[in-house]
Amino acid sequence: LHIVTRESAGIRVIQDLKGKRVSTGAPGSGTEVEALLVLEAAGLSPKDFAKQERLGAQESASALSEGNIDAFFWSGGLPTGSIVELAATLARKGDRIQLVPLPPQSTPVQVFQRRFPGVSAPGVIPKEVYGTRNDTPTLSFWNFFICPASLPEEAAYALTKATFENLEALRQAVPAARNTTLENAVRFVGGAIPYHEG
């Protein structure tokens, strides 16, 4: 999860979003769902903002660059092109991109993981990805194949088998899939989301 801002905005921790103009993601998106849940875990809500926007990553990056918002949430793989472009644009303007940390021991992370076991794990956005001053601790969210329990076992098995037999092709097409491994796939068995028998 990215919480993106610029150094000149003075946002160092999630509580600093109070009184700021913040985009929580496009309406109904995974980003919006995750942002609202993390804010709730931090004891915040969009009512605490000076203004809430509901923009996608590209629109949020443009709004931040133009000074129309102070921060935005984005849930996506590393790197995200619009954030790379934002970092370059801010540098040309004499500012610098900053990511708000969500350390593993912080209240928002601890509360979120207790409420939703098996949905996320502590992660790090390395400073090299966007040219930030430091590595940024965050919550990593996993991609899931979601299907109804009524999906035939053979079909679920065939999807799973095809995915894991073609990981190299998947990783070439989607760089963020580098973390798609059998070990990660079974990491959350018994968590909040039940696994299909297939």
Model-derived regions: residue spans:
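An extracytoplasmic/periplasmic, membrane-proximal ligand-sensing/linker region
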Residues: G76-G94, L99-P101, V111-R114, W142, ...
